[in-house]
């Protein structure tokens, strides 16, 4: 893969997450009855960062959960090729029934990951509302899904790939576009 450009650096990511945090607080009139749920793997770290910023804004801690969607993916057979899927499990510290759940992921592309995440959430409870926060929306939707909170819209071609690097997993914060 050939890197074409860095489209978000660490400062731009920090600003985008701060803006999303303010938007979440404003839209929900605070964060009472809200839970952030990160989709494994990078969505978890983004959710934790959002919770930290929201805590600074609101002066209260926000619950953060982890969602493993491995068994809910519709491309599982395409990925596994006769191997058993590696399931890490979900960890959501509160009952999500009647709560506003804000799903968090790094990149929104076809919408299939979000659909799988909603299926997984419904098996864990019945939230009053599901909202979606993403760092990057790259377009190319295959399902009627849109994000409520977007760090940056980055239009891409289907021949390009978006890579999100986060300090927690990649020792740096940046978003890059690559040729496939």
Curated annotation (Swiss-Prot):
GO molecular function: RNA binding; uracil phosphoribosyltransferase activity
Motif PRPP-binding mapped to chain: 101-113
E.C. code: 2.4.2.9
GO biological process, one term: DNA-templated transcription termination
Top EC class of this enzyme: transferase
Pfam families listed in its UniProt record: Pribosyltran
Keywords: Glycosyltransferase, RNA-binding, Transcription, Transcription regulation, Transcription termination, Transferase
Reaction catalysed by this enzyme: UMP + diphosphate = 5-phospho-alpha-D-ribose 1-diphosphate + uracil
Family from the record: Belongs to the purine/pyrimidine phosphoribosyltransferase family. PyrR subfamily.
HAMAP family, per the entry: PyrR
Oligomer and partners: Homodimer and homohexamer; in equilibrium.
Function of the molecule: Regulates transcriptional attenuation of the pyrimidine nucleotide (pyr) operon by binding in a uridine-dependent manner to specific sites on pyr mRNA. This disrupts an antiterminator hairpin in the RNA and favors formation of a downstream transcription terminator, leading to a reduced expression of downstream genes.
Name the record gives this protein: Bifunctional protein PyrR
């Amino acid at each position: 893969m050939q890197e074409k450009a860095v489209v978000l650096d660490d400062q731009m990511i920090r600003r985008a997450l701060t803006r999303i945090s303010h938007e979440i607080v404003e839209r929900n009139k605070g964060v009472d009855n809200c839970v952030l749920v990160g989709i494994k793997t990078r969505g978890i770290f983004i959710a934790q960062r959002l919770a930290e910023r929201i805590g600074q804004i609101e002066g209260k801690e926000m619950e953060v959960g982890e969602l493993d969607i491995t068994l809910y993916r519709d491309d599982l057979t395409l990925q596994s090729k006769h191997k058993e899927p590696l399931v890490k499990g979900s960890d959501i510290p509160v009952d999500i029934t009647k709560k506003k759940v804000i799903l968090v992921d790094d990149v929104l592309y076809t919408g299939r990951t979000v659909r799988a995440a909603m299926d997984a959430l419904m098996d864990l409870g019945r939230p009053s509302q599901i909202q979606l926060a993403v760092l990057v929306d790259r377009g190319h939707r295959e399902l009627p899904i849109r994000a409520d909170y977007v760090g940056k819209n980055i239009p891409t071609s289907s021949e390009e790939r978006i890579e999100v690097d986060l300090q927690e997993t990649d020792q740096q914060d940046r978003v890059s576009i690559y040729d496939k």
